[in-house]
UniProtKB/Swiss-Prot annotation:
InterPro entries: Met_Sox_Rdtase_MsrA_dom, Met_Sox_Rdtase_MsrA_sf, MsrA_MetSO_reductase. GO terms for biological process: cellular response to oxidative stress; protein modification process. The active site is at C54. Keywords: Oxidoreductase. The keyword Oxidoreductase applies. Pfam families: PMSR. It is an enzyme of class 1 (oxidoreductase). This is Peptide methionine sulfoxide reductase MsrA.
Amino acid sequence: MLGIGAFKQRLPRPGEALPGREQALPLHNTHLVNGHPLRGEFTGLAQVQFGLGCFWGAERKFWNVPGVYTTAVGYAGGQTPNATYSEVCSGQTGHTEAVLVVFDDHAVSFAQLLRTFWESHDPTQGMQQGNDMGTQYRSAIYCTTQAQYDAALASRDAYQQQLTAAGYGEITTEIRFPAPTFYYAEDDHQQYLAKHPNGYCGLGGTGVSCPIGLDA
């Protein structure tokens, strides 16, 4: 039998992932900071999912961006439906901690969101982010359109040049289209740093400026 530690640096294979559940976790559907819904159709708005380490600090990065309509934290990219936080932390779901960003692309460009993403964490660290270790902290961009996917790949290549010049290694960010199912996390984790202003935030960027989104 595999121990939890076996999944700190690799994703579970088919048959190894936890089974999860059919029913979604309970969710209070109002954003604590801006009052907008966390879940809905979001007609006329764009969506993307970002993984950049612990989702508590990652969500705050994006709810502070003008033009972002709402944000929510959850689990994505893995195999276990409607996983719980403890299940994700075991490494046996395959999910990364993710932020759903719903935005008005007339008010904020996708390039600007990509710049926030790249500059807010170290995308070269593989299955960890800072002191947070495990597959659930891996860097990821889950795109909802082909245009987003193409832009994400181009931004990765542009930022890689800057990181290489600064002495960093290869970007390990997982970039996917179409986006996998986003499973909303428990209520306690939504807008966590608004509820707990002095709460833990392990995010730290590289200090290397991303060359995209400057004029977008």
